[in-house]
A protein has these predicted regions:
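Catalytic-site beta-strand/loop segments enriched in glycine and acidic/polar residues
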Residues: 133-165, 169
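Catalytic core of membrane glycerolipid acyltransferases/transacylases, capturing the structured
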Residues: 73-125, 169, 185
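N-terminal amphipathic/basic-hydrophobic helices that include classical n-h-c signal peptides
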Residues: 1-25
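Membrane-interfacial amphipathic helices and adjacent loop/beta segments
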Residues: 38-60, 98-139
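Generic beta-sheet signal
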Residues: 99, 121, 147, 175-178
Length: 246
């Protein structure tokens, strides 16, 4: 039957996209395979290391963060759009909250090669379980990493997770952001950043933020909003600092 003008068809129905459709099917099959997932994790880690290694990085607050981590576990947070290259940049010895979905497991496999221990439970069903595990990691002396707008967004909207974790453990919160003079942006909900090779980049860690102990809902929401505002301001400062280096 001839196609009607204006009719909508899935991409797989068009020969033009058959190659990409087949590639997507093969990728999904590989993600479900233990060996395939491991191989993809290795390739992903290699890409991460290459993109980071081909940049000239200016790091602010990195040594201070490492010193704080030796004295007390930290809760390190950054927006989901900064996730791709943070694994090679973070101090080693952290535990990271990861999605239990196949793509999350691939990212966890790549991150593990850079010294990050995965903690499963970033999906809505596993949120309470993930929080309990993060509490256990902090009590055992390990710093933890959270993307507080992941894994589905909304973009740059901070969840209550970091506030709850800090209230339960007393651990301080460190904000992180990176930027570069040449970037790719993914057409995804978070507009994920990827550094183009052979450019300059900034990585900024904030000073430690201590949250006052409270059970008041309004006070907790004020803390959440404060962290969201400060993290957005840090991203803006990082972007502006990079622009100033042009």
């Amino acid at each position: 039957m001839p196609a009607r003008k204006g009719a909508l068809y899935p991409l797989s129905a068009s020969p033009r996209y058959s190659f990409f459709y087949a590639g997507g099917i093969m990728l999904k099959s590989a993600l479900r395979s233990t060996i395939g997932s491991f191989v993809i994790s290795l390739l992903l880690a290699a890409v991460m290391a290459l993109l980071v290694g081909l940049r000239r990085w200016h790091r602010q607050g990195h040594k201070a963060l490492r010193t704080r981590m030796k004295a007390q576990p930290q809760i390190i947070i950054f927006w989901h759009e900064h996730l791709f290259v943070m694994s090679p940049l973070l101090p080693s010895g952290c535990s990271a909250l990861q999605s239990p979905h196949p793509d999350g497991r691939v990212l966890a496999g790549a991150s593990r090669l850079f010294g990050l221990r995965p903690i499963w439970g970033s999906s809505n069903r596993k949120a309470a379980s993930g929080l309990r595990q993060l509490v256990g990691e902090i009590k055992s002396g390990r710093s933890v990493v959270i993307t507080p707008d992941g894994p589905r967004g909304p973009r740059r909207a901070l969840s209550m997770g970091p506030v709850s974790l800090s209230q339960l453990t007393g651990a301080p919160i460190t904000l992180a952001a990176w930027s570069g003079n040449r970037l790719w942006r993914a057409p995804s909900w978070d507009k994920m950043r990827f550094p183009k090779p052979l450019g300059r980049a900034n990585l900024i860690y904030s000073d430690a933020i201590m949250l006052e102990k409270t059970k008041d809902k309004n006070a907790l929401e004020a803390q959440r909003q404060m962290l969201e505002d400060k993290l957005n301001a840090l991203v803006e400062a990082c972007d502006n600092a990079q622009t100033g280096q042009k």
